[in-house]
Amino acid sequence: MKGLVLSGGGLKGAYQIGAYKALKKLKYDFQIVTGTSIGAINGAFITAKQYQKAVTLWENAQIDFLFTEKLNENLIVLEYIRNMIENKGMNVEALKSNINKYLSKKKFFKSEIKYGLVTVNKKTLKPKYISKEELNEDNLVDYLMASSCFYPVFQSKKIENDEYVDGGYHDNMPIDFAIKLGADEIIAIDLEAIGIRKKVQGKAKIKYIRPNNNLGPEMIVSNKQIRKNLCYGYNDTMKAFNKLEGKKYTFKKNELEKYLKFYKDKYEQLARKKKKDYQLTKEELRRIIESTCTILKIDDTKIYTIKKINNIIKKQVEQKGFFKEELKNINKKKITFAINDKIALYISII
């Protein structure tokens, strides 16, 4: 059976929903979903087959979407510290209300998908692995909150007579839980966030999807970053399955190979004129293009053709005067082949 495992990672979690969009496009059906912290919340929406509701929840995320108290966004770290001292953490009942608003419990329990989450008993520090069969409509959202309570930044979650904290304190990527539920083929979406990693003990074919770009802080609410993370998740997943290419930037499939043939001779001939024995490979072409885009601060969420990105590069260089000295040096036969000189050489042939 196919399993989807979602790590914890706070406000980086939109990445997982973007990744799931790609998996849907690739016709992946999962029989098992497990998650920790934000991964547990995302996993509940996926189990309920409410992908679009999850997107809406993330796109609407603002500071008051999470916290009951009115906070100064510019001093959010100080607000966290103040609440840790005065209130034993932030009150996140607003998040609970919004999960209740968007997540259909009926669809969750009607779904044939097996589900599991992880939380930790605050007093005993023992983990609690909870499967769908142990949940009901009354306690589902409470346990989602328990798995996500990043104590002491957030208040712990009391359920019946026990208090619970974030499952990431024990198992931030519950792969073995998915195997226990029956998964033998797993896609694990790793936010590379703070949390305990367990060495996988069970046997399963595992494919990891990890971010190529910076997803921003785990605890700072930025709607702009959230929307970027949705794109990053989609792009990285399509790259992981060889449907797109690139690393920090994203290009349509086979674009780099196509343009390598077009530029290779020109680039190497010009390099030889500068007395540099230089070979242009596909990987080096990618690195030069992406380095250029990074310096020029070109949008890294979009999917480009090389022709399109070259036009943007040329326009930016003309308008802003980037690499002016390096381009002059090429004309004067002064070239070191530091990355900026490689970029200038590339710009001169596109």
Mark where each language-model region is:
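Patatin-like phospholipase
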Residues: M1-T36, A44-I350
